[in-house]
């Protein structure tokens, strides 16, 4: 029976015109640390109606509506009721060939943002063009045909055959392209949202669909001009959730169907069996026409409330305008990357249907669930700049995740990647230094201690340094123990049978690995810091001693004095002389001596024959024979030097030259840790520029980057799965951390770092959450300002400055400052008094 129709004028007054309130975006405590059984299983049911669900901590308060958090459903929204009833709203787009695009939308993303990580506002554009043929592909083929002397005869023949085919396909796709703009804003207490879909081309058909997100029990129906649905709670079977979708105008057609397949058949011109599994509204739009709607989830049936289109638009406009006002944002050549990072990580925020919270998807086309390898550790550090709530949920999710099949059964970071434990330890520690939150430390610490204590099984000769695990004879996978796949460092190690160990079936090898031992030391150092915070002094002493032992051994055995590099070495004493950015990893782990760090930076990092240049850093040194050895190289080609043929890899793939965000982030942190402020700023500026080049050009944040400007890895790539890869944001976060950061290294973990000696121009970043305060920074050639909670607390004039160990007290502040010339500094403490002094160029400790 149809519900009573509420007059349009009452709609927004009932559901709330404001964006999502703080009560809805906070972390619920649920029932303390109680774990919920995987949703959708028998274990997820149990509580009776009226009982509080056994939600895990941390998670989102129920009920909630979140746009775009079901994997790759960028145009849709997930609705979750109090008892964990679940509903999916999707916006589908029909292609000219009659194919319905309704989920797994990564290939069809056209424009991203603006958006927020809490779902208060989200905007995307999707298109029927999957960009498998792009102008760069066609240009590359023309280049091959025009210069047959530079390519093999078979490559020229392949290009000659494919160019007309791909040109025809491209022209057809462009002529038939349909693009829509989708906007959402959460309303009221966060259980509802309003949305709008705008056709950017004529003859556009879109579908508004209500269904179950993961095939769970639910029923749907038509009700007047709208759609309704109901579903039992997965945590509380006796509690039923209800959803209503209310459009502002009648659809051209509508129906309820027995399955998604039936619905798809019906909206694409066929017939579909009626039923209650899915309901859909179909609209046929001309260019510029917009459909608006509202949707809400509740514990009881919802009255039909039809919104006014102009009220929906007003709410969307207000929420969109608030994106920069209440979330990470910035300006300037580097600072503007803050908005891109916010949008990218908001896009890749996903809901874990088993552990009932949000996390950051690592990549693989935006899907694949939670990944507990090293990738997601970078995602946690980056997400912490965007949203404390998201970062804490993400890293908690990692440490509650079971081991992948056929692996050592450790909960948390996966053991087949020996750097996943160290990197997640570093990520968890940075959540503590950023927010002062011990909850994730307490959860992570036992698993990380176990991970650390298993690592000696990779010490083949029992000398205290680790050797590379054997990962098989496939060249492309021999570096998989560190996620380095085909890195040439690992091409020639030898297998040695392992005795005993954790149950990991891999054997040992004869290669003492600089990178692996740097991670080993990082884990020991981080565990020592965690142990001090958690009141475990004996553990702190043990792990600090372990870090010192690795530092001594690595400097004794893996420093090549003639080359001035930390290099891996075989057990027979011969050196592995392949030079990659892992030579800098001892700086990241605090192992390098100050003099050796200076040699690494001045003689190697800044050498354009090795690593320096407009693009940094290649995954193999440019003067190493292994550089770009993964395929043919065409030196005379201006823009397609590394292009081979359509659909195939290129010379820098994968770790044979391409620039990788985790490598850059590791090198940057090491350089910054050792106090090379000028170099760190220049490095961060280059990393950020590479990220922004891809973002500005295609709205992508790719898995890896070209090692040289204007080349073809990403522009000519066909595989769209790597275009929205979360760790890409680590490139831009270097620039943002250069402006303001926590202090993850020595000294007071509550202290701040801010300012820069060498980022270009004047840059700002705002709405950065650190230790319970909201910060903004402006840093330019002759003025640096730090604002806390809306009040200026630091100002330096006359020079560029980089500030470390900044601690603001009620009656003053203390900090270390590095200035590129004489400057005046002022501190405005909590007592309201201004305190200032002059500082010379160089380094000065200041107490005011």
In which residue ranges do the predicted regions lie?
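Terminal accessory carbohydrate-recognition/targeting modules of carbohydrate-active enzymes
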Residues: 2, 40-330, 721-726, 741-848
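N-terminal export signals
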Residues: 2-4, 10-30
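C-terminal region of N-terminal signal peptides and the immediate post-cleavage residues
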Residues: 25-47
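C-terminal capping/lid segments that line or modulate ligand- or cofactor-binding pockets
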Residues: 49-86, 424-427, 431-434, 560-604, ...
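Extended, well-ordered alpha-helical scaffold segments
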Residues: 307-311, 315, 333-341, 387-399, ...
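Extended glycan-interaction surfaces of carbohydrate-active proteins
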Residues: 328-368, 393-412, 464-512, 552-659, ...
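Aromatic-rich carbohydrate-recognition surfaces in CAZymes
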Residues: 369-492, 514-517, 576-577, 657-674, ...
């Amino acid at each position: 029976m149809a519900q009573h129709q509420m007059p349009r004028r009452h709609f927004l007054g009932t559901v709330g015109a404001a964006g999502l309130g703080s009560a809805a975006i906070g972390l619920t405590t649920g029932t303390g640390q109680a774990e919920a059984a995987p949703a959708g299983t028998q274990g997820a049911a149990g509580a009776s109606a009226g009982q509080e669900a056994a939600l895990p901590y941390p998670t989102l308060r129920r009920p909630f509506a979140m746009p775009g958090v079901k994997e790759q459903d960028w145009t849709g929204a997930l609705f979750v009721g109090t008892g964990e009833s679940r509903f999916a709203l999707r916006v589908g787009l029909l292609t000219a060939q009659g194919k319905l695009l309704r989920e797994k939308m990564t290939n069809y993303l056209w424009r991203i943002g603006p958006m927020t990580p809490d779902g208060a506002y989200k905007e995307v554009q999707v298109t029927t063009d999957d960009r498998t043929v792009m102008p760069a592909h066609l240009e590359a083929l023309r280049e091959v045909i025009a210069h047959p002397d530079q390519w093999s005869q078979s490559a020229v023949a392949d290009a000659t055959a494919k160019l007309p085919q791909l040109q025809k396909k491209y022209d057809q796709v462009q002529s038939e392209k349909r693009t829509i703009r989708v906007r959402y804003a959460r309303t009221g207490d966060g259980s509802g949202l309003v949305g709008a879909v705008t056709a950017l081309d004529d003859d556009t058909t879109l579908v508004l669909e209500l269904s179950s997100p993961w095939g769970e029990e639910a029923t749907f129906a038509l009700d007047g001009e709208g759609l309704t649905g109901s579903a039992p709670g997965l945590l509380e079977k006796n509690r039923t959730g209800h959803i209503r979708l209310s459009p502002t105008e009648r659809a051209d057609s509508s129906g309820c169907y027995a399955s998604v397949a039936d619905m798809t058949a019906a909206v694409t011109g066929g017939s579909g069996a009626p039923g209650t599994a899915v309901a859909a509204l179909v609209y046929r739009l001309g260019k510029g026409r917009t459909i608006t709607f509202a949707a809400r989830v509740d514990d009881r049936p919802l009255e039909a409330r039809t919104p006014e289109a102009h009220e929906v638009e007003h709410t969307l406009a207000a929420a969109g305008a608030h994106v920069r006002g209440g979330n990470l944002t910035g300006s300037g050549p580097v600072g503007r990357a803050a908005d891109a990072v916010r949008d990218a990580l908001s896009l890749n925020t996903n809901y874990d249907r088993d552990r009932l919270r949000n996390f950051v998807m690592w990549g693989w086309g935006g899907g694949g669930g939670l990944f507990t390898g090293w990738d997601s550790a970078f995602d946690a550090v980056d997400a912490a700049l965007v949203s404390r709530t998201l970062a804490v949920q993400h890293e908690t999710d990692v440490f509650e995740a079971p081991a992948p099949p056929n692996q050592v059964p450790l909960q948390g970071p996966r053991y087949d990647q020996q750097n996943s434990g160290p990197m997640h330890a570093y990520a968890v520690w940075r959540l503590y230094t950023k927010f002062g939150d011990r909850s994730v430390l307490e959860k992570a610490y036992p698993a990380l201690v176990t991970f650390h204590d298993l690592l000696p099984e990779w010490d083949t000769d029992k000398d205290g340094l680790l050797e590379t695990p054997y990962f098989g004879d496939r060249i492309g996978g021999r570096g998989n123990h560190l996620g380095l796949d085909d890195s040439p460092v690992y091409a020639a190690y030898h297998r040695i049978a392992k005795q005993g160990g954790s149950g990991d079936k891999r054997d040992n090898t004869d290669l003492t690995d600089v990178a692996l031992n740097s991670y080993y030391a990082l884990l020991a150092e981080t565990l020592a810091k965690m142990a001090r915070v958690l009141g475990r002094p004996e553990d702190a002493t043990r792990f600090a001693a372990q870090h010192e032992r690795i530092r001594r051994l690595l400097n004794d055995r893996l420093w090549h004095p003639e080359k001035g590099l930390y290099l891996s070495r075989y057990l027979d004493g011969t050196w592995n002389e392949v030079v990659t950015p892992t030579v800098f990893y001892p700086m990241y782990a605090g192992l390098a001596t100050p003099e050796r760090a200076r040699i690494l930076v001045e003689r190697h990092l800044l050498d354009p024959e090795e690593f320096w240049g407009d693009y940094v850093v290649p995954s193999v040194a440019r003067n190493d024979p292994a550089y770009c050895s993964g395929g043919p190289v065409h030196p005379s080609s201006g823009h397609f030097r590394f292009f081979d043929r359509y659909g195939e890899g290129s010379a820098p793939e994968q770790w044979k030259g391409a620039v990788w965000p985790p490598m850059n982030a590791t090198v940057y942190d090491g350089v910054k840790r050792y106090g090379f402020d000028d170099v760190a700023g220049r490095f961060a500026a280059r990393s950020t520029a590479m990220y922004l080049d891809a973002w500005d050009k295609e709205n992508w944040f790719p898995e890896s980057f070209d090692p040289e400007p204007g080349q073809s890895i990403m522009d000519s790539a066909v595989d769209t799965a790597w275009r929205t890869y979360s760790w890409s944001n680590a490139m831009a976060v270097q620039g943002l951390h250069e402006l303001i950061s926590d202090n993850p290294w020595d000294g007071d973990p509550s202290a701040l770092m801010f300012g820069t000696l060498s980022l270009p121009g004047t840059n700002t970043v705002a709405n950065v959450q650190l230790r319970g305060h909201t910060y903004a920074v402006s840093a330019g050639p002759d003025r640096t300002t730090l604002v806390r909670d809306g009040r200026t607390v630091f100002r330096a004039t006359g020079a560029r400055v980089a500030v470390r160990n900044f601690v603001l007290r009620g009656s003053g502040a203390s900090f270390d400052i590095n200035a590129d010339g004489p400057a005046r500094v002022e501190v405005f403490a909590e007592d309201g008094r201004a305190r200032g002094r002059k500082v010379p160029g160089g380094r000065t400790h200041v107490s005011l």
